[in-house]
Amino acid sequence: MQFLSLSRRLIERHGVEAFTPELGARESRRVQEMYAEGKLRQVWRRGDTPGAAILWEAADEDEVRALLESLPMFQLGMLEIVSVVPLHPYPGFAPK
């Protein structure tokens, strides 16, 4: 099943300077690992606020949340999970 998550960086709590290049590199490595595992399908930077929109392939919402919680920024309390939305196929493209 696919899910869409939105997260945001907690800059107001930690300050921009806390989001170092080293932390960004650790976050990127974890994202790449989840992509290689087939769990993370696509990732985008949000245009409205610092954070990410991620398309996931997972059994359920609990699995998605566990994957998000494995991110270094989340583990440091620097990332908020705004929403996790289950997605269903759009029937308008199905054969008739």
Task: List where the protein language model places each region.
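Conserved, structured core segments of small domains
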Residues: 1-96
